[in-house]
Amino acid sequence: CGVPAIQPVLSGLARIVNGEDAVPGSWPWQVSLQDSTGFHFCGGSLISEDWVVTAAHCGVTTSDVVVAGEFDQGLETEDTQVLKIGKVFKNPKFSILTVRNDITLLKLATPAQFSETVSAVCLPSADEDFPAGMLCATTGWGKTKYNALKTPDKLQQATLPIVSNTDCRKYWGSRVTDVMICAGASGVSSCMGDSGGPLVCQKNGAWTLAGIVSWGSSTCSTSTPAVYARVTALMPWVQETLAAN
């Protein structure tokens, strides 16, 4: 897991406001969650052939689909996999009011076929550390300006630093809890439509899922950290759910 066949190229600190187009296929775990009309509403990450992790607040149902192997949503010619969702496992501790425990696991009805452009991200162990200042990456088809009418066609990426929860609370106060991890305030920001997608950090050469795009500034301010679900804190529930299903 976590080693793309097509290497990503990050130009350092490039939403994904102020992001840049990704190299096609270089974030092979990134999926698009689309409703029955083909509208992209959230991102997600493949963690195996059968499972996708996304944000609980995305409100995914079994009538939505997971699209894997996509880069340009404006192209009909891409070799994408449109995968039906068999079952939705929303974290029972998720609260829409506090946005805590913002994680949902999707069991695919038919497994994804792994290829050069479709593969899994690594999950962290529950005790893994992603220290403040560590440079990580986030990807998505979210808005590139908060007031944009539509989302970009091409997958966007940005490099951004982890922000400690203590520093993050300087912006957000007590809303930031230990089931969250912050990143950004560095000239880039996740934005609407990126939700559910990955915040990944490279550990020993493999990209590992540190966060799930959860919430942040309503104007996608690039000087304010965005808040992600902290995957390490949610790993006990993830392991339990995968083991039981």
UniProtKB/Swiss-Prot annotation:
Family indicated by similarity: Belongs to the peptidase S1 family.
Cysteines engaged in disulfide bonds, as pairs: 1-122, 42-58, 136-201, 168-182, 191-220
Annotated active site: 57, 102, 195
Domain Peptidase S1 positions: 16-243
Coiled coil (residue ranges): none
Listed GO CC annotations: extracellular region
Localisation: Secreted, Extracellular space
Group of enzyme by EC: hydrolase
Domain of life according to the entry: Eukaryota
Protein name, per record: Chymotrypsinogen B
